[in-house]
C-alpha cells in the first residue's frame, strides 16, 4: 500500500486506482518534475534542512531516473498515482531512506503547480518559435510575388484589387499579434509556486528566491492559497492558442478555396495533399482541412479548462488534475498545425495568371471609377449611384468596363472623358499608397518591416 494511504485501513478499489491515476498523461512532466526536485534538494541542503550528503544522493538519483526515462528503461508502474510518485518510488529503490527527505517542506500541490508553470513557459517559447517559422514562409512567398495582383473579397464577392503579398502579410500581422499574446502569457507563467506547501506555506526557512533563480523563474508567488489553486496561466495559453488556431483556420479555408479547380489560385505541393480511395484524379487539401477541423479541438481544450475552474473554492481540489490533458493536447495540436502549415505555405505554387484572369471579372474597378468621378468634382454618394447603374448596364450588355465606349460611359455622366481608360488594375493599386495600403511602395515597406521583425526575433529569412 502506498504511504499516502497510511491513514486508511484498506487499499483503494482497483477501479478507483484506474479512475484517479494521472500517470498515463502527466508522465510528460518528468523533466520539469526532476528539475524542480533537484533545485529543491539543493536548497534544502543549503538551508541546513537536510544534510549535504542526502541532498547529493537525491540529486544523483534524480539524474539516474532522468537518464532511465529518456532511454526508455524506466518502468512506469500502472498502479502509481502520478509522475511525482513514480519518480519518488524509483528514487527510494535507488538510494533508500534518503529519498524520503526530498519531500520535506513540499506538497504535491505546489510541486505540480511548479511543474506546469515550467511546462507552459516552455510551451510559450516553442509556440512562438513555430509561429516565427510560419511567418517566415509567408514572407518568403510575399517577396517572391511583389507584382502579383488578385481580387480582394468582401462577403466572398470580388471587391477591389490587391497585391498577393498584401494578402499574405495580413496573416503575418495576425500571427505577430499571436506572438505578442504568447509573450504576455509567458509572463504569467513565469512565477514560481514552490514553497507554498499544500495551501498555507511551510514552517521551514526555505530560500524560495534561490530555487526560483535555479529554475529560471523571474518571481515567486505572493499568496500560497492562490499559488496552489490558480490555473490562470494555463487558461491564458489555451485562450491564446484558440485565437492562433482560428487564424490558421482562416488561412486553411482560403487554401482550400484557392486550390480548387474553380479558383486555381494556388497549387499545393504533393507532399501536403492526399488522394481519394475511389476517384483517381483527386488532389485533396487534407492538411488545410484538418487544420480547420482541429480548431474545434483547440476551442474544446479552452472550454474544458474554463469549466473545470468555474466552481472551485480555495484552495487545491482534485478537479485540477483535469488541467493537463487539455493543455497537452492543445500544445500538441497547435504546434503540429503551425509546423505543417509552414511547410505547406513554403512549398505552395501561386498562380499569377489565374489571379489576373479573376480580376477581369466582377467589375473590380468599380470603386476606382467612382473615385475618378469624385476627382472630377462629383460627390462620392452621387458617384456611387452612377457607377452602380453603370455596372448594371455593363452586366446586361455582357461587357467589361474596358469594352464600354466613351459614349456608353457618358450615358451615365458627362464627367467621363477619355482618361477613364487610364483607370486600370495598376492605377488602382498605385492609388492606395498610404500606410497599410496595397500599393507596391507600401508593400515594399511592409516586407521590409516584416523582415526586421523576424531579424529582431533571431529568425533567418
Swiss-Prot record:
Instruction: Give the pathway annotation.
Output: Amino-acid biosynthesis; L-arginine biosynthesis; L-arginine from L-ornithine and carbamoyl phosphate: step 3/3
Enzyme class, broadest EC rank = lyase
Q: Keywords assigned by UniProt? A: Amino-acid biosynthesis, Arginine biosynthesis, Cytoplasm, Lyase
EC numbers? 4.3.2.1
| Classification via Pfam families | ASL_C2, Lyase_1
Q: Name one GO biological process term.
A: arginine biosynthetic process via ornithine
Q: Does the keyword Amino-acid biosynthesis apply?
A: yes
Where would you say this protein principally sits, based on its record? cytoplasm
Which superkingdom? Answer: Bacteria
For this record, the Gene Ontology CC terms, alphabetical, are: cytosol
Q: Which CDD domains match?
A: Argininosuccinate_lyase (cd01359)
Q: Which NCBIfam families match?
A: argH
Q: Which family does it belong to?
A: Belongs to the lyase 1 family. Argininosuccinate lyase subfamily.
Protein name per UniProt:
Argininosuccinate lyase
Whose protein is this, by species? Dehalococcoides mccartyi (strain CBDB1)
